[in-house]
Design a protein with these regions (language model features):
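Active-site/binding-pocket entry motifs
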Residues: 28, 73, 135, 161-162
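Short glycine/threonine-rich catalytic loop with a Thr-x-Gly-x-Asp
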Residues: 47, 94-95, 188, 192
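DPxDG-like acidic metal-binding loop motif
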Residues: 77-136
């Protein structure tokens, strides 16, 4: 079984290149806390820099594929293949100097996700999953836990966002769910990494 397909290799290369900018920018966050412009503007600029590198690398390797990205939206409109990009998943963590964020890229073929990667540049953890080929962390095969009972599990959740229109309702549902399951519930601030750790 081939560990990484050509498309996975393209995504890995793009992530590694973009992560250099992301790590540099993350190191500058502390200095920006006292600047006049503000750290929020810096994060937006960092998001755009990382996104630009990802798009350039992906388009260079696969010019016919379309791209859906968080910052700029849709590029091209190829119905067959589409890259889906989140340049910084866990932006609030990034902004506050918390080293728990990731770059994520998925590849959709005819509206079905066929592969994806989640890269934590701080820990140098590369999660790779491909339909029919399994999932890997730094080239080591990942296995599903043998736990069968919900009471033995830990739940990761995204919870309501601060800017959600239905935030109050979402928060009530979140608290209601958390109190019913009586299990350890985690919300670490990067949905992509949280899913990878499940």
């Amino acid at each position: 079984m081939k560990l990484n397909s050509a498309n996975i290799n393209v995504m890995v290369k793009a992530c590694r290149k973009a992560s250099k900018v992301l790590i540099r920018d993350f190191g500058e966050i502390e200095k920006l806390q006292v600047s006049l412009k503000g750290p929020g503007d810096f994060v937006t600029a960092s998001d755009k820099r990382v996104e630009k590198i990802l798009i350039e690398e992906l388009q260079k390797a696969r010019p016919d594929y379309s791209i859906l990205s968080e910052e700029i939206g849709e590029i091209n409109n190829d119905k067959s293949f589409r890259w889906i990009i989140d340049p910084i998943d866990g932006t609030a963590n990034f902004l506050h100097g918390i080293p728990h964020f990731a770059i994520s890229i998925g590849l959709e073929k005819e509206k079905e996700i066929i592969c994806g990667i989640i890269y934590d540049p701080i820990k140098d953890e590369m999660f790779v999953a491909e339909k029919g080929n399994g999932s890997y962390l730094n080239n080591q095969r990942m296995r599903v836990s043998s736990r069968k009972k919900l009471k033995d599990c830990i739940i990761f959740t995204g919870g309501p966002r601060n800017n959600s229109k239905n935030r109050e309702l979402s928060l009530k549902e979140y608290v209601n769910f958390s109190s019913k399951v009586l299990l350890p519930v985690r919300k670490l601030g990067s949905a992509a990494l949280d899913m990878a750790y499940v």
